[in-house]
Amino acid sequence: MSANPFLDPAFHIRWSELAPEQVAPAIEAALAQAKGAVDAIAARDLGALTYANTFLALETATDALHLAWAKVTHLQSVADSPALRDAHNAMLPGVSAFSASIPLNAGLWIRLKAVAATVEARALTGIHRRFLDETVADFQQAGADLPAAARTRLEAIQTELAQITQKYSENVLDATNAWQLVVTEEARLAGLPAHAKAAARRGAEAKGLAGWRFTLHMPSVEPFMTYLADEALRRELWTASAAIGATAPQDNAPLIGRILTLRAEKAAVLNKAHFADLVLERRMAKTGARALAFMEDMEARAKGAFTRECQELEEFKAQQTGGEAARLAPWELLYWSEKLRQSRYDFDEEILRPYFPMDRVIAGLFELAGRVFGLRVVERGAQEVETWHPEVKFYDVRDGRGRHVGSFYADWYPRESKRGGAWMNYLITGGPRADGSRVPHLGLMCGNMTPPSEGKPALLKHREVETVFHEFGHLLHHLLGEVEIKSLNGVNVAWDFVELPSQIMENWAWERESLDLFARHHETGAAIPEEIFLKLTAAKNFRSACGTMRQVALAKMDLLMHMRTAEFAGEADVEGKARAAVANCLAPTEPAAPTVVKKFTHIFSDPVGYAAGYYSYKWAEVLDADAFTRFKREGIFNARVGAEFIETILSQGNATDPAELFRRFMGRDPDLQALLVRCGLAA
């Protein structure tokens, strides 16, 4: 056991001992060790090189650094504080510079190329052949063959990108937390669901305030904008939400321009036309043009229905208010959409909340994992395993043979110190080892779901249930990885393939058989009445073209900014330019709503992240809709199909080209038709 808990490799992490003042000594020590290991490989005698003492040695050279840094970055996501942020940011340049330097290390690259040309290397097969080829491709794509001056510039670009994208992320979090709305007149909360009202009351009490406190966190925003009758209050909250990342001192506009410029420069140094071509070169889409064409095809297919849906909403509001059909204000969209849904389907999503208590959803998810994938998930108590917050739970996962395949943490509720959204991540990549042993994986799932309130359990919206299933799909991809090479295991796959395991899991949240495993009224234990279930499924594609066009807008904005950077990076009004680029995909409102460009953390909070890759969500929808047809055809609880999905997809990581993995499961290439049918764009 290391004296510094950030350096302790133990499977059960000592979260209570991880203090900000320990970050610097831990990361400095881990960096020194990693640099020493890499330098040793780069200095090996050219006459004594082997695959083991170069490629395999490099694979493990940074293990300690990766684990220590993973603890730091994870804590900053779930338990941010000024001291932790300062400690993280002090170490960020050094960690980023070191990571960027590895593929640009001339001595290292000379030795890897030398080994790759040997008889030993040519004789490699299976995962070791894949690892050698992928490593060589990684180095070439990163610029290993460039002149020294170009390599030095690339290192500097990566370091600056790490710092600027971190600042972008901090601005979004700080702006989100800086705003609150306190309502003291209960009459103004007409229409607000009881759970949201109770949560707002609890939020006010926690701050020592009278009344009801609303924030810019999604569990507060969504019911407020969807149900609150008071338009003035909706406008006030919408205005604040639209300003996230757009006003001083958290204005992200200058950072966006610099991030885009640096990414474009990186692509140019690496002899690529633009950043999209650079990052997509080894993904399924291959080029920015192909990804853009895919999204434009989806746009064309959805355009007619999108226009009709927008007109229908305008006409519905006019009918209800006795006015003329006209553009809605952006703070009216969710409100009148919900009114239209209730009118058309006699269905209010809130009626489902009592059937989705979080604990039952989780239990049902685990039951599903047992039936389909042969897994057993067991919770470990707080007295057995430490976590970073009392709300966090810890679970062990065993497969059908009783093997401990891995464990995970689950952290589902919002806190001011926690970033928004939902995500899966990992701390330890296990799997088989060369000596025949097996190491368990360690992962985590986080979200910002509706929390418990006033003695009631956390009651989720159906969309939140989908999100839980989604993140669990990512988690299974990690926990079930059976690849000996850690960097090729689990979710370390092409970005436009990584969403397949997550998105396919969402399908079970729509099936009556699987819902019956867990969807029970938290007070009566009754299952969802058939009438309500039929209304849920009937309303599934309500305004689905608008949903599709929103995804198209985000993906096109992302791609266009990274393919035509000069048009955006030097633009004083980056918001106006971004809006103009995707105007045809945006719901028409008066006034026009700003885009999410200044709070688009998917593409601007990481040096790469989803940059030029947001299209991956829709790309993977094609894969998941098609793949789920096998379960629909052969049985949604069919354990044989589940075992095949593990064998061909979940266990394989990046052991094989993703298109080939899909073909192994489906017996053919992907078919778009299943997605078009599922989202109501085809019969």
What are these regions (language model features)?
Residues T450-F469:
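Short pre-active-site segment immediately N-terminal to the catalytic Zn-binding motif
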Residues L7-Q22, V72-M91, K113-A156, T215-P254, ...:
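Short His/Asp/Glu-rich catalytic/ion-coordination signatures at enzyme active sites or charged loops
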Residues N252-A264, V439-M445, V483, Q652-N654:
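Short, hydrophobic/aliphatic alpha-helical segments
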Residues A30-A37, A61-A64, A68, L262, ...:
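Amphipathic, well-ordered alpha-helical segments in soluble domains
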Residues F131-L132, E160-Q163, E170, D174-T215, ...:
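Active-site-proximal, well-structured secondary-structure segments within enzyme catalytic domains
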Residues M1-P25, A29, A190-G191, G211-R213, ...:
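C-terminal, non-catalytic "cap/extension" segments appended to globular domains
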Residues M1-L192, F631:
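N-terminal helix-rich structural modules
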Residues M225-Y227, R419-G421, G455-L459, S514-L515, ...:
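Short conserved micro-motifs at the rims of enzyme active sites and ligand-binding pockets
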